[in-house]
Amino acid sequence: MGLIFSAVGEVYELSEEQFPVFSAIAGASGAFIHLYIDALASAGVKNGLSRNFAENLACQTVLGSAYLTKQSDEHPIELMDTVCSPGGTTIEGVHTLKILGFESAVHQAIDAIIEKDKKLGSC
């Protein structure tokens, strides 16, 4: 069975206890990424880019970052640090996202999905 599925993607073996977390991340994160891409594009439009160009730019940036993370042996935070110059614009944006609770919001969203899954008895 794994051979069939591996032809179209990666196959993971996990325990029953891990399935709700897997399902939350694999199932919902696509929606989160679409939301993030839209937020990037909307910020671009707000600051003078056309919608089409801003969406394409956001998509290409997310694709490139995801590809680099997948291909690299470095932790995502290490990769982030490579593009954050001390005192620069990128670290300023990262700092702002952290202050506004970006990571916490993602964690809370995953936790909410797992809790909802438990209430629905899906897993």
Where are these predicted regions, by residue range?
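A ubiquitous short alpha-helical element
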Residues: 25-26, 49-51, 78
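Catalytic, metal-anchored helix/loop core of enzyme active sites in primary metabolism
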Residues: 25-26, 31-37, 123
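Gly/Ser/Thr-rich helix-start
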Residues: 10, 27-30, 88-89
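NAD(P)-dependent Rossmann-like dehydrogenase/reductase catalytic/cofactor-binding core
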Residues: 55, 59-123
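Internal alpha-helical scaffold of NAD(P)-dependent oxidoreductase catalytic cores
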Residues: 1-21, 33-71, 116
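Short glycine- and Lys/Arg-enriched binding-loop motifs that mark or flank ligand-binding interfaces
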Residues: 23-25, 84
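A short acidic, helix-capping loop that chelates divalent metal ions and anchors anionic groups
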Residues: 21-23, 92
